[in-house]
Amino acid sequence: MSKSTRRKEAGGAVPGSRVTRRELLMGAAAYAVLPPFAFSTPSAAQFFDADALEKIADRDPEAAAAFIVDAQTHVWWREGGLRTLTPSGEHFLKTLAGTRASVIGKPVPIADMGRMMFIEDMFLHSETDIAFLNSFGMRGAFDGVDLFPPREAAFIRSMAPSRIRVLGVVDPPDGQSAVDSLIYQCEELKIDGLKLYPPGPVTTGWRMDDEKTTYPLYEVLRKHGVKNVCVHKGLPGLFLEEYCHTADLARAAADFPDLNFIAFHCSFPFEAELAEHAQKAKVKNIYAEMGGLAPYMFRTPERYAQMLATVLNGLGADHVLWGTDTPVAGPPHWQILAFQAYGFPAQLVESKGYPVITPAVKRQILGGNAARLYNINVADASRAIDKDLLYKLRVDGNPLPLEVDPSKWTAG
C-alpha cells in the first residue's frame, strides 16, 4: 500500500470501535518515535502532529531533519578525573548523572560522562551536524581547576574539526586574570564564542552589564572578532537564583550592539522577563537557546508550550537556537525527532495567539539561526561532514565491534 493510500484511509473508524485509524496510526508512530516517558502525561499528545510522526516512523525522506546545529553540549568528566570535590561540586555532578539516568532508564556513573559519551551521543546516535562543546568553570567546587577547561574542549574539537565548535569560559570576578585567559583562548585556542555561568554557592556574584567586571571581556571578544556571548540564564537549581534572571542583559546588549547575547535554556522559567527586557530596550541582539528543556515537552506540556510561544512571539523565530544540553538529557536523537513532530494545537493558536510552527521555522531553529550567528556556510559544512569518518560510521550503522573477542586474536 502506498503512503498516500495509507494516509487517505487513516481517518476512518476501526470496525467495532470508536477509535479512528488515524488515532491508531498516531499511537503506533508515537511509540516508535518518542521516548518512553513521553506517555506519562496524556495531555502532551495534542502537541504532536500525526502526519509528522508517521513520516518520521516510516523514515520518509520528507521528514529528514534539516541542518542541525546544537548550541549546547557538554563533557562532564574531564581527562584525568577529579582529585577532590566540595559538597556542592559532588551534588552538582550527581544531579547531572541522575537527570540522565531518569531519561535513559538506567544508572549513569559520573565518570562515564566524558569525551567518548559526547562523541557517541552527538555523532553516532543522533542526526546532529555541528555541536558547540561548552567549557565549564566553577573551579571552587572542583579542586581549583575548571571542571571542563577550554583547552580540553579545543583538543576534542581537533578529533572532529568539521563537527565540533568550542565555547570558552572565564569567571568574570577574576578580573585581569579572566581577561588574560580570554585573550589566550581567543588567540591560541581559537574559541568560537564565550560561555558564562552565574555564580554558585562558592563563587562571587557578577552581572552581565557590569562595566568593571564583564565589559572588559566583551572588548576582548570584539577585538578578536568573536561575536557571541552565551550565558546560563534560568534553571537556577545549582546556581544562585538572583543571577539567573535576565534584567542584566538589555543594557549589555545595547552597549555592545555588534555582539550577540544568547540566553541559554530560554531563561526558563523566566522567559517572559527575557522577552520583555529585549522589547523594552528595543535591542535585536538578544537570543534564546533551548537546551535542557525538551523533557518539559512531555512532563509539563502546557508550560513548555507557553515558554516556547513566549520566546517565539517575544524575540522572533529568527532569534531562537536549538540546543539539547547533552549528555544530561541523554542522546539528542529523541529530542530532535520530538521537535520535528511538535506544534501548537489550533485552539491555542486561536485563543492564546501562539504562533504556527511551520517547517521553515523549525529549520531556522534547528540550525539556520546558529549558522547565521556563527558564520557557518551550510553548503560548505555539509560537504565537509559528508567526508567525515563519524558521519560514515553512523550512516553505515556504526559497524564497530562493541566487544573484543580474545579467541579471535592471532599471533603476529
Ranges and model annotations:
Residues S2-R7, V14-F39, S43-F67, G80-M122, ...:
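Mid-to-C-terminal alpha-helical segments outside catalytic/metal-binding sites
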Residues E90-M113, E120-F142, R163-V169, D192-G193:
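Divalent metal-dependent hydrolysis catalytic cores, especially in the metallo-beta-lactamase
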Residues V108-I119, V145-F155, E211-Y215, H245-D248, ...:
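Well-ordered, non-membrane alpha-helical segments in soluble/globular domains
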Residues A50-A52, I130, S135-C244, Y287:
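Active-site gating/metal-coordination segments in enzymes
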Residues E79-T84, G144-V145, V179-S181, W206-M208, ...:
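Short aromatic-enriched loop/helix-cap "lid" or pocket-rim segments at secondary-structure transitions
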Residues Q72-R78, H232, H265:
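Histidine-centered divalent metal-coordination motifs
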